[in-house]
Amino acid sequence: MSVLAALAKAEAVRAGRAQATAAVRHLHLAERPLVAVPLRLAGEAAAPVAIMIGTSPGDQNVLTVPQPRDRVLRLRFIEQLADVVLPYLSTFLVDTEELTSKAGETYTRCLDAPQMWTPNPGGVNFLKLLGRSVRFHRVDGDNPVPESIPLLGRWLTWFGDRAEHPGSAVLPAMTAALSAHWASGQSTLEDGNLAALLGWIDPPSGFTGAQAAALAEDPLLSPPAGPATDPGFDNEELAPLIAAYNAALDDAARSVAAERLERSLRGQLEPTWQLMWRSIELLSALPEGASVENRWTDDRGAFSRFAADVAEGIPQARRDSAVPAVRRLLERERALEALQGQCAFDDPLRMLEHRVSGAAFRGTVVHSEPERLDRSGSRPKLRPHIHLRTTDPFIAVVGEELTCVERPKQTGLVVEIEGDSMVLELSGGMGRKLVAEPGSVPEEGDDLGFARFKPTPFNGMLNLPAREETPWTHGGPPPEWTPPTDDEGEELQ
């Protein structure tokens, strides 16, 4: 935990409600999100009990499995879930655009992409496991299943994989999204409770955040947000209701038992459902960060590519081989670096973390030379000088290059340091002439920020060894076998 994060939590305790740690929203919020609140059977990794799912607060579908250990009923549940999810996904495949890559190839990209919300990371993992459990089911031969079941499995697997990509917003967890924008007065572990976290952020009238969070700890008042259920509910309600379904002797009795089970599970799901939509309202009240749209464009591209693979019948790999795994890891490392830089440049509150750590600073321009030219080369270049004074704990180094926060395309080279001030030589973002464009060079009295990192790090091609130069353990060709000599054979014996 950083110093500022600890300070924000302490201030939340003092003020009695969560403190904002972001001035803008750092993830995309869809106009028509699909909210899913799943519950699973205790002790089973991918045995669904129920799910409440829908695209609006008053239009929810409740799907249940009266006997979660019955694989036939489980597949029937997944088929019903596919009837909700797949039509939602198909609406985003209608409107597309034709684009041309740098290599001259034409490709199609959807104008929008789906967004599924779950209450917490556990919900994300459960949906991914549920998808992986059925994505290879056969639709022909012995014991065939409807085509929608493995198709939903492929899509849920893709959503789960994409959710691990830093900056992606196709399958966000609500507790993670709220914690990224507010600091509560409780521990990080306690922030995993959606009701308690929302109690700090938006406490009921007459309650402090701590009081609202304490009430949220009572499973009778605020049932768990899933996918795990409360042990008391499991023992006192769920187990007897499932036993009653098992003991039913005819279809009428089973129907009554299933209805009783659905009513009970609906009571567990409804409070979390309301919390999810209230959380979406709170997030939508924040202005969107400048770089959010670019990250959503990446999500749209990933969605479009996978949809094309599904349409062409390209199989989904069971697991990554060595080279694709390396590429995936490198892409995620780059995406994480870019996400951190973009959020800092979008949000002054996020940039504070870097200012405290000495990776960035803000200062006042005390002198500006906008018309200065560098004549050291064969041709003169426009290289204005600005003198900055700062009180931030920033230790500049002569020769290092800094990026301007207000003008990300403009960099400043540290050429001189004098006490609490420094001289920067500017380049970029001023036009191509020997006279700077109006407003492109800071003037005396301007307040500016500079950082040691960029909002968009270098994103060139991933250079991996050729296949013949890759070890066989990592996808390369197997070593050539040579028969052992007589001496070597005797040693092996």
Model-derived regions, located:
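Long, charged/polar, low-complexity intrinsically disordered N-terminal extensions
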Residues: 1-115, 126, 132-174, 233-234, ...
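C-terminal effector modules of nucleic-acid-centric enzymes and ribosome-associated factors
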Residues: 403-405, 411-493
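Short aromatic-glycine-enriched beta-strand elements
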Residues: 50-51, 383-386, 422-423
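Non-catalytic nucleic-acid-binding interfaces of large nucleic-acid enzymes and RNP effectors
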Residues: 73, 81, 379-383, 417
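Beta-strand-rich binding/interaction modules
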Residues: 395-404
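Accessory interdomain/linker segments of ATP-dependent helicases and helicase-like nucleic-acid enzymes
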Residues: 255-396
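Extended non-globular interaction regions in eukaryotic gene-expression and organellar proteins
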Residues: 118-119, 127-135, 147-285
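Flexible loop/turn segments at secondary-structure boundaries
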Residues: 42-46, 122-127, 368-377, 395, ...
